[in-house]
Regions:
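A short, hydrophobic C-terminal helix/tail in secreted or cell-surface proteins
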Residues: 254-259
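Bacterial N-terminal signal peptides that target proteins for export
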Residues: 2-10
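Short coil/turn segments at secondary-structure junctions
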Residues: 11, 81-85, 144, 221-224
Length: 259
């Protein structure tokens, strides 16, 4: 089903209105000492079925903008032969995005980073089999996250990997981790080699994690940090898909099981 991107904007406005209107009721509920029993979430397409009686004047105003956005979003830039899911402890899609980050480190140094890292929360949809459109990538990577290349000692890298293990895994590339089902790190190697406490390693990640968010406080101990201007994760992934398509290469990824 084609997604109406113009309606996404109105969908966000509606969501904002609902948020504001619910603030008072949430505050009142707190007085009665309610407790949250369960939280669930799922992807909901914001398409024409939510707007069966569109305002004619609004449609006329938005029409030229909608056509421009649709032309851009529906552009097919590649094709995937397999469906790539996201999820812990690791997944095809998360590891692929981490590899794109790792390779993108060549923008600030003469080789890929030793490790690539992306958090599962930064990926908001799967990569389905079949055509890949610009809109597909926007659905997967809706945030304005940018590349950061961090340089850190082996001791701090181990702390980073321990944090990743405690989260039951994240999207990684260039490393191999063995973790238990309860989030304990058993072993880790970089490029097939044990981690040297005194060696400096480079980690390509996103600015959100580089700032210590997502339980990645170990990044705050980094010896160096370079975040090239304009290198958004979404832009890097779009470039990757286009380059693979131009070279007639398949989109591949690797994922292993937890210990």
């Amino acid at each position: 089903m084609k997604q109406n991107y113009a309606k996404i904007i109105s969908g966000f406005i509606l969501a904002g209105l609902l948020t504001f209107s619910s603030c008072q009721s949430t505050h009142e509920m707190a007085k009665t000492d309610y407790q949250i029993a369960k939280v669930e979430g799922r992807m909901i397409d914001i398409d024409a079925k939510w707007d069966t009686h569109p305002d004619a004047d609004a449609v006329a105003i938005l029409k030229p903008y909608k056509e421009k956005i649709d032309n851009m979003m529906y552009e097919v830039i590649g094709s995937s032969e397999q469906k790539m899911d996201k999820g812990h402890p690791e997944s095809l899609l998360s590891n692929l995005v981490a590899e794109v980050l790792r390779q993108a480190a060549t923008k600030v140094q003469d080789k890929p980073a030793d490790m690539g890292l992306v958090n599962m929360g930064g990926l908001r949809n799967i990569l389905p089999a079949g055509d890949i459109t610009v809109g597909t990538v926007y659905e997967i990577l809706p945030f304005e996250n940018s590349l950061c290349v961090m340089k850190m000692k082996g001791t701090h890298l181990k702390a980073l990997l321990t944090s990743i293990a405690s989260l039951k895994g994240e999207g990684v590339s260039g490393i191999r981790m063995e973790i238990t089902k309860d989030g304990k790190l058993l072993n880790a190697t970089v490029g097939g080699q044990p981690i040297d406490d005194n060696k400096l390693y480079t980690v390509a990640t996103i600015d959100y994690l580089a700032d210590g968010n997502g339980s990645m406080e170990a990044f705050l101990q980094a010896d160096d940090r370079v975040c090239p201007e304009g290198a958004t994760l979404r832009g890097l992934f779009l470039d990757y898909v286009r380059q693979q398509t131009a070279a007639c290469l398949l989109y591949t990824s690797d994922a292993a099981d937890e210990a």
